[in-house]
From Swiss-Prot:
Pfam family, one: AA_kinase
Higher taxonomy: Bacteria, Pseudomonadati, Pseudomonadota, Alphaproteobacteria, Rhodospirillales
Listed CDD domains: AAK_UMPK-PyrH-Ec
SUBUNIT field: Homohexamer.
Organism (species): Rhodospirillum rubrum (strain ATCC 11170 / ATH 1.1.1 / DSM 467 / LMG 4362 / NCIMB 8255 / S1)
Enzyme class (EC, first level): transferase
Recorded family membership: Belongs to the UMP kinase family.
Keywords: ATP-binding, Cytoplasm, Kinase, Nucleotide-binding, Pyrimidine biosynthesis, Transferase
InterPro entries from the UniProt entry: AceGlu_kinase-like_sf, Asp/Glu/Uridylate_kinase, Uridylate_kinase, Uridylate_kinase_bac
Binding-site residues for UMP, renumbered to this chain: 61, 81, 142-149
Subcellular compartments: Cytoplasm
Protein name: Uridylate kinase
Keyword Kinase belongs to the record: yes
Amino acid sequence: MSEDQPHANGAYYRRVLLKLSGEGLLGNKEFGLDLEMVDRVAGEVKAAHDRGIQVCLVIGGGNIFRGISTAAKGMDRTSADYMGMLATVMNALAVQNALEKRGVQTRVQSAIPMSMVCEPYIRRRAIRHMEKGRVVIFAAGTGNPFFTTDTAAALRAVEMNCDAILKATQVDGVYSADPNKVPDAVRFESLTFTDVLTRDLRVMDTSAIALARDNNIPIVVFSLHTPGALADVLDRRGRFTEILCDSHQE
C-alpha cells in the first residue's frame, strides 16, 4: 500500500482482497440471497476493476449455513464446517454470475476440488488471472474444518501479495462495542493489531489477525450497506477503520 500518494489508477492500492460476509448478501431476507444486493456488490467490484485495481474476494456462507452455530446444537463440528464451506461455493457462484452479467471476467477457485463447478485453488493460476484483468473469488474457505472464512481471507491475501484486506461488514468501522446494542459505543478511525487483540474487538478471529499482522497487511473495515463505500475506501475517503501494524501507527 502507498501511504503517501495514489497509484496511476488514482487508488492507494494495486491489488486487494475483499472479504464479504454471507449475511451481507441477505439484504432484507432472513435466509438465502438477495439478488439485488448481490448485483449491487458486483457493481462496486466492477467499478474497482474498471480502474485497473486487481480484485479477489472471499465470501462467507452464513446466509445459507453456519457451521459453528449448527455444531453448537449437536452436529459434529467437522461435518458442520464442511457444509458451511459448500455454502460459500454457492455464494461465490452467485457473485460470479452477477459480475459476468456486467462484463467482468470472473473465476471461482475452490479449496475443495469440484471440477464440474469451478477451478481448484492454485495460487499461481489465481495470480495470473488477476494479472490478466480477471476477478477471482476464493470459495470453500481454507478447505479445512475449524478455520473461519476470515482466516481464509487473511491466508489468501498473504498468498496473493495483496496490499490490503477490505472487510465489508454491517457497520461503518470498528466500534468499542456493538453499536446496535450500545448506542454510545465509540468508533475508531484507526487501530493497531495489538489494539484489536488486547481489547478483544472481534474484528476477525485471532488467527486471521495474526496472519495479517505477521505479513504486514492492513485491514480496512467499512460498511457493506453504504453505496459507493468500496470506491471511497480505495481512495481513502469516507467512513472506515484502518488496522495497521504498530510501526505504522503515529
